[in-house]
Amino acid sequence: YFYKSYWPFIPPQSCIAVSRNHLNDIFDLLDFDLFPKIWMDFRIGIISKYIFNEFKVLNKSYTYYRQSNENISSNYKFLSKNWWNRRKEAHEYIMYFFKSNNIDHKKNFDYYITNIINKFL
């Protein structure tokens, strides 16, 4: 369990489909005042996995994702200081989410490594 990831594969927002039944419930659970670096797609994925127990990844392409230097994700280059900082905030969001929703959890290896690296940045 020490190595288990608590977050699912998160596709870009344009690739997420949500049933109408869950849409209002999801928006009720989204809180953007806390953890501002955590994007909506990540939050929807976590809510879908842990609250609704429904998270499916289809092996089909319905949209195409294009990366450019102008989009917001370009501020989070892999293993950069910003990337590690946002990853730490994602772990903090997960801990807050689990505690707020009474979901049993344990901190994993990634949590500890991310926090150690952030101490040196």
Which functions belong to the PLM regions below?
Residues 77-85, 107-121:
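Non-catalytic, C-terminal membrane-associated alpha-helical segments of glycosyltransferases
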Residues 1-78:
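Conserved nucleotide-sugar donor-binding catalytic segment
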Residues 63-69, 75-104:
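Catalytic core of nucleotide-sugar-dependent glycosyltransferases
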Residues 46, 101-102, 113:
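Prokaryotic Sec-type signal peptides and long signal-anchor helices
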Residues 51-52, 98, 120:
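Generic structural signal for hydrophobic core residues of well-folded globular domains
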Residues 14, 56-59, 96-108:
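Noncatalytic linker/hinge segments flanking ATPase motor cores
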